[in-house]
Amino acid sequence: MQWGRILTAMVTPFTADGKLDLDGARRLAAYLVDHGSDGLVVAGTTGESPTLTHEEKIALFREVKKAVGDRAAVIAGTGTNSTAASIELSREAEALGVDGLMLVVPYYNRPSQEGLYQHFKAIAAATTLPIILYNIPSRTGRNMDAATTLRLAEIKNIKAVKEASGDLDQATAILRQAPADFLVYSGDDSLTLPLMAVGGYGIISVVAHVAGEKMQAMVRAFTAGDVQGAAALHRELFPLFKALFITSNPVPVKEALQMLGLPAGPVRLPLVGATREEKEKIAAALKETGLL
């Protein structure tokens, strides 16, 4: 299993009238792989998974995998708040030849820690693919405790967690006791370097859409022992770390992609596009980092 350290949580391109833009998805996927992404996560939070149909997700998994082939890992976002539905989608994704699955903590129904364990255990038993768990309590309404993550890490095909809790202590607690081959990815671009400093593996990134090569340079500097160089790149990227999250993700990154002439299109309701003030801040951050 070689996913790489920078996985981009890819946006889902739409046409001006809100239809799925598969040609745009293929072109964007190829661009991202050519510009610093080791792999792509498809139909996750940044991919607007709540407003994608089952059929659209399947089409995205198929076409993105075709577009990048063996050049990069394609991780399918198949987690939902229904265990049965997640199993069905995961099996279909596996049949399409994706390289792994990302499973979000079930949202809205607020399961207990035991419920979370049983949910992920059941999905893992239904697939042979390696799995990334995805903990994002700000969106799901339920934090997956470190103890639960550690229980799940003992399951042979659960290989990683995307920790988007923003809690470095929680990530550290996982890293202290997890199996040696269990990977902890940051779910927050701005915490990539701090998390790697305590043993994290990499980032499932939004910012890599527009600054993948700079993100890659930061990670490579750190892993080569050039901590000062990595820190300098972190500071250089800081305006983007903030500007691309000034309103609900993926609204800002889609605006940034459009400014750079890359496939993105609008967001789907109930999300709405950035305000004029937000667009100005996004453009300013792109200019400050030499991208626009």
UniProtKB/Swiss-Prot annotation:
Q: Under what name is this protein listed? A: 4-hydroxy-tetrahydrodipicolinate synthase
Q: Which residues bind pyruvate?
A: T46, I204
State the function annotated in the UniProt record.
Answer: Catalyzes the condensation of (S)-aspartate-beta-semialdehyde [(S)-ASA] and pyruvate to 4-hydroxy-tetrahydrodipicolinate (HTPA).
Q: Give the taxonomic lineage as stored in the record.
A: Bacteria, Bacillati, Bacillota, Clostridia, Moorellales
Any idea which UniProt keywords this protein has? Amino-acid biosynthesis, Cytoplasm, Diaminopimelate biosynthesis, Lyase, Lysine biosynthesis, Schiff base
Q: Which organism is it from?
A: Moorella thermoacetica (strain ATCC 39073 / JCM 9320)
- The residues annotated as site (Part of a proton relay during catalysis) are T45, Y108
Active site located where?
Y134 (proton donor/acceptor), K162 (schiff-base intermediate with substrate)
**Where is this gene product found?**
Cytoplasm
